[in-house]
């Protein structure tokens, strides 16, 4: 009986470990997305620097530039006060990077698919907003004396073309 009980406990423990491993692998870490309005931007075509910082699943080589070409779509526009709007944007893209100690023939991919908000001022009612991006700058954050890092950083120049009613 004792042997059977220990065997059942061992099987249960293995099942719990497998379940936790599967859950952890499916979980994605949300990106930190910050939009900063550029100095001198106009109300009709505000220009933002969108910084996307994402923790990667595995450490990446800081000397290998990752590939990330995000696309942006407008999900909603809400009037939150006099001439004040809150725009919900969705960013979608795949980060392709070279893991440490792997070589350039071995790459990994990680998806970024997330909503974020940007405040917009408009004296007249907004009917639509069209996002457009400039040249994206990607990199792996370098930590002193380390050739690997799990922190991916992307700076995206984003212009919002605002159509008013």
Where are these regions (language model features)?
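Viral structural modules
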Residues: 1-165
């Amino acid at each position: 009986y004792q042997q059977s009980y220990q065997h059942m406990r061992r099987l249960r423990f293995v099942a719990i470990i497998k379940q936790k491993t599967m859950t952890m692998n499916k979980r994605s870490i949300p990106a930190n997305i910050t939009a900063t309005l550029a100095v001198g931007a106009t109300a009709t075509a505000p220009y933002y620097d969108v910084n996307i910082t994402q923790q990667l699943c595995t450490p990446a080589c800081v000397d290998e530039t990752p590939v990330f070409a995000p696309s942006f779509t407008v999900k909603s526009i809400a009037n939150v006060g006099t001439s004040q709007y809150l725009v919900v944007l969705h960013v979608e893209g795949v980060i392709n990077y070279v893991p440490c100690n792997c070589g350039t023939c071995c790459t990994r991919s990680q998806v970024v698919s997330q909503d974020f908000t940007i405040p917009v001022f408009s004296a007249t009612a907004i009917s639509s907003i069209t996002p457009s991006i400039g040249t994206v700058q990607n990199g792996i954050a370098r930590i002193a004396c380390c050739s690997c890092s799990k922190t991916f950083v992307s700076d995206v120049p984003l212009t919002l073309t605002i159509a008013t009613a």
